[in-house]
Amino acid sequence: MAGVKEYKCPSCGGVLEFDSTLQKMKCPYCGTELEVEALEAYDAHLNDETPDDMTWDNVQGSDWEEEETAGLRTYICESCGGEIMTDESTAASNCPFCGNPVVMMNQFSGQLKPDYVIPFKLDKEAAKEAYRKHLKGKILLPKSFHDENHIDEIKGVYVPFWLFGAHADASFRYNGTKKAVWDDGNYIYTRTSYYSIFRKGELRFEHVPVDGSTKMADDLMESIEPFDFSEAVDFRTAYLSGYFADRFDISQDDSINRANARIRQSISDTFRGTVHGYQTLEEQDGNVRLTDRNASYALYPVWLLNTTWHDKNFTFAMNAQTGRLVGDLPTDNKKMILFMVGLSLIFMAIIFLFFYLRA
């Protein structure tokens, strides 16, 4: 004998029962009522859901030509393990990541050759000016940091990025609520209505970036985005002249999870932005299927600025294409306390005036 199928309440997860009086499905736990037809449509949607398919093919890439590597040099940092490459006319004495001395290797040993490069658009002076502007208006910044601070080192570095592209078919399900409140003079009533909201659609993603270097903090690199890929060109070693290129030490395979997370979050945010009119909205589940997948390897331009204050190192990064600069700054604890006290006094004054005027 076939088993009896149970239907879950979309609001609380309890088992729905058929109410013969209402001729509806009703949850005995939260009181949610559903038309049988609506429940069948809801169940059909759930049955259509499939697991995520977000796999990728490996980048084939291209090998270096002998004449391309002849003029390249590789430097190794003995402290952080950073490995950079540049042309033979550009000398490196310090690591752009940690500032410690680097050792030159006479022979370049090639990895996968980059497919694309976005050339440096802004020069070193633009990076210095962006840094000075970054310090302005920071009321909690210690005065000594502003007065005594100077840039220890500034270097232009091409950061390796894996770029992912795909066509996405996705569907997401949300639980939403709407509340109505009224009174009859004696009691205040609240009616909460529960809804299941479905969204389904297709999106195209191109050149989703994931940095391929362990020396570059992920949040730092994501903070200086976006890069404009329309200005990317086919890679040529000539673009390395005067700059350094970090060599990737995170493979494409190891970058896939971050790429998938960024794609999935972007889809979720896009779908969620189409749902309006609910007091609460909670994502329940979703699935994403990727097709027409591709990946490539590119170098993006970044200015790295290193400075030292009170024996602590501070690193700032600037997008050398757009000029966006980010980096953490120290906080003056005394200024912070005074700032919080000031806010508290203002808040208390507003409350006092509110009750005083009402009285």
Language model: regions and residue ranges:
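Residues immediately within or flanking Cys/His clusters that coordinate Zn2+
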Residues: 4-6, 24, 72-74, 92
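Short functional micro-motifs and their immediate structural scaffolds
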Residues: 15-17, 35, 85, 103
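Charged, low-complexity helical/coil segments in non-catalytic cytosolic or luminal regions
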Residues: 69, 110-308
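Extended, hydrophilic extramembrane loops/domains of integral membrane proteins
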Residues: 300-326
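Juxtamembrane boundary at the C-terminal end of a transmembrane helix
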Residues: 349-359
